[in-house]
Amino acid sequence: IVAVDCSDYPKPVCSLDYMPLCGSDNTTYNNKCIFCNAVVDSNGTITLSHFGKC
């Protein structure tokens, strides 16, 4: 199981780093911060599918 620790999120501003992650909603998130903010916004319904683009 792949997992990302989102305990420090949400954050008001994300960097522009490009290290894509694929969410369980089949959306490619550009980096961990953007992904974790989406996870928090979704109340945990979005999870990490895999690292890299969907």
Swiss-Prot record:
CDD domains associated with the record: KAZAL_FS
Site (Reactive bond 3): 16-17
Cell compartments where the protein resides: Secreted
Glycosylated residues in this chain: 43
UniProt entry tagged with the keyword Disulfide bond: yes
Primary localization: secreted
SS bond partners: 6-36, 14-33, 22-54
Cellular component terms per the entry's GO annotation: extracellular region
Short name of one Pfam family: Kazal_1
Gene Ontology molecular function: serine-type endopeptidase inhibitor activity
This protein's record includes keyword Hydrolase: no
Domain Kazal-like: 4-54
UniProt-listed Gene3D superfamilies: 3.30.60.30
Entries under InterPro entries matching the protein: Bifunctional_prot_inhibitor, Kazal_dom, Kazal_dom_sf, Prot_inh_Kazal-m
SMART domains xrefs: KAZAL
Keyword annotations of the record: Disulfide bond, Glycoprotein, Protease inhibitor, Repeat, Secreted, Serine protease inhibitor
PANTHER family: OVOMUCOID-LIKE-RELATED (PTHR47729:SF1), SERINE PEPTIDASE INHIBITOR, KAZAL TYPE 2, TANDEM DUPLICATE 1-RELATED (PTHR47729)
Entry domain remark: Avian ovomucoid consists of three homologous, tandem Kazal family inhibitory domains.
The protein, known as: Ovomucoid
Organism name: Haemorhous mexicanus (House finch)
Lineage: Eukaryota, Metazoa, Chordata, Craniata, Vertebrata
